[in-house]
């Protein structure tokens, strides 16, 4: 299949899906705001990124990925880099953040082009990948509770409190069996209305309040960062080292596996194409101060949870970002700072639970449990058949243990790399135990054969 024919098929599928369920696609496009908004706003306020460039280039990335892959792949912040820039002021300079993003992108791009990512994917067991997804999902739930919902009062302020969070959560539960209900779209519209009300009713100087409202601030791509990105300083390199395992495992390997689980009827993007996509997104946008971004399993789960089933959803999101970035740019910061945490937190929880749910297929339906054989098909004609491998109780227990060990490492140390190492060590320990047991049984059979009498 040529590139043009592939793109034509993808666009036909995108259009057909959008026509079939337009509200679901629009709602799904907004499903990942819980991950995007808090980090993007925090980085923009402290000057670590340019909000206008971030909206423009992340919007372009959304449009391109939706048109090329045809599934709702998210464009998310690089969380480890963002966390370091926010928590440590000396790491928050824009040139440092951009250099860190470029280091990660260069590394992922090199791994993709050399085939190293494919080798890693073949040799990472499914229970470890599932553990990374489960850990990422539970991390989102915990982050929603600790950073968005915990400090809210029950009744104050009137438009952002725990009662609103409880109400949003109950509506989420009641509508979970109504796939066409545009939950994220409704929450987004309500949140924007609350943000406008919060700004309008805020006490202070009228001129300051007017500055907090969006106004025409047309983006001009003149803030070129040139070559002064401090590439070889310790700070960007250390930030990149912390981000690389997260990007490789969660934004490339795990998101490819999750796409196969959630959208089995759609062509699954390869880890190589995911890596190239991450590399190119940042090697372009970071020169203009755009936030370092990647794909992510959590974002895909969130957009799927709220209705997205094709690339049409993120193409619409990309167009919205592009328009906002070009027309309003940095004037949006004041409004976005008042986005209600109560409603945002519930969306993050829903996204985390959707991602964590993929762990249920570990012992039934996982990709490594399907076996292919040549033989008679059901209609009597010869062909290739697929059947599900039956696991013993010991195998089920072993796979659960490896997955939970991976998840435990992620949650305990808040680090995907440590969780990955813990899961792999657990997996290899089981393999070593199996080989040791076989060797010992072989020794016992040889010994018993040597000591048996010749005549009976």
Where do the PLM segments sit?
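Intrinsically disordered, low-complexity regions flanking or connecting the multi-pass transmembrane cores
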Residues: 1-20, 24, 122, 379-381, ...
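Membrane-embedded helical hairpins/re-entrant loop segments and their flanking transmembrane helices
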Residues: 2-23, 42-64, 239-311
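Hydrophobic, membrane-embedded alpha-helices of multi-pass small-molecule transporters
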Residues: 23-34, 160, 164-168, 200, ...
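Transmembrane alpha-helix interface/packing and boundary motifs in multi-pass membrane proteins
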Residues: 27-28, 63-73, 241-246, 280-290, ...
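Hydrophobic alpha-helical transmembrane segments of multi-pass membrane proteins
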Residues: 27-30, 124-128, 158, 238-248, ...
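Transmembrane helix-boundary motif of multi-pass solute transporters/channels
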Residues: 27-89
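Hydrophobic, membrane-inserted alpha-helices
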Residues: 35-41, 58-62, 79-84, 164-173, ...
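Membrane-embedded alpha-helical modules
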Residues: 90-202, 316, 320-456
């Amino acid at each position: 299949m040529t590139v043009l024919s592939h793109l034509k098929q993808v666009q036909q599928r995108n259009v057909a899906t959008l026509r079939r369920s337009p509200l679901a696609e629009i709602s799904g496009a907004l499903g990942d705001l819980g991950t995007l908004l808090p980090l993007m706003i925090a980085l923009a306020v402290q000057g670590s990124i340019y909000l206008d460039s971030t909206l423009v280039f992340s919007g372009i990335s959304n449009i391109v990925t939706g048109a090329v892959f045809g599934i709702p792949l998210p464009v998310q912040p690089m969380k480890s880099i963002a966390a370091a820039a926010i928590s440590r002021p000396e790491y928050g300079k824009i040139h440092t953040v951009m250099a860190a993003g470029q280091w990660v992108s260069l590394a992922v791009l090199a791994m993709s082009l050399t085939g190293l990512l494919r080798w890693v994917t073949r040799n990472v067991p499914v229970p470890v990948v599932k553990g990374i997804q489960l850990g990422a999902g539970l991390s989102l739930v915990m982050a929603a509770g600790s950073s968005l919902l915990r400090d809210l009062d029950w009744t104050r302020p009137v438009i952002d409190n725990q009662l609103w969070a409880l109400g949003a959560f109950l509506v989420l539960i009641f509508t979970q069996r109504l796939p066409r209900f545009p939950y994220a779209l409704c929450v987004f519209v309500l949140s924007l209305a609350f943000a406008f009300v919060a700004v309008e009713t805020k006490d202070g100087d009228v001129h300051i309040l007017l500055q907090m409202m969006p106004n025409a601030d047309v983006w001009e791509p003149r803030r070129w960062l040139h070559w002064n990105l401090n590439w070889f300083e310790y700070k960007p390199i250390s930030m990149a080292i912390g981000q690389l395992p997260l990007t490789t495992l969660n934004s490339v390997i795990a998101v490819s596996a999750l796409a196969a689980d959630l959208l089995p009827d759609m062509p699954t993007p390869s880890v190589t194409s995911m890596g190239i996509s991450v590399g190119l997104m940042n090697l372009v946008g970071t020169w203009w101060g755009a936030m370092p971004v990647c794909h992510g399993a959590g974002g895909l789960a969130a957009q799927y949870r709220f209705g997205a089933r094709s690339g049409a959803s993120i193409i619409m999101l990309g167009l919205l970002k592009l328009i906002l970035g070009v027309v309003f740019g940095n004037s949006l910061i004041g409004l976005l700072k008042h986005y209600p945490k109560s409603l945002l937190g519930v969306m993050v929880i829903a996204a985390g639970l959707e991602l964590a749910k993929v762990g249920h297929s570990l012992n039934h339906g996982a990709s490594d449990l399907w076996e292919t054989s040549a033989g008679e098909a059901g209609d009597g004609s010869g062909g290739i058949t697929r059947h599900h491998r039956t696991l013993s109780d010991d195998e089920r227990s072993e796979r659960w243990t490896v997955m939970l060990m991976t998840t435990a490492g992620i949650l305990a140390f808040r680090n995907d790399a440590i969780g990955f190492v813990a899961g792999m060590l657990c997996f290899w320990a089981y393999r070593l135990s199996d080989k040791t047991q076989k060797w010992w049984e072989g020794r016992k059979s040889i010994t018993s054969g040597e000591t048996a009498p010749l005549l009976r």
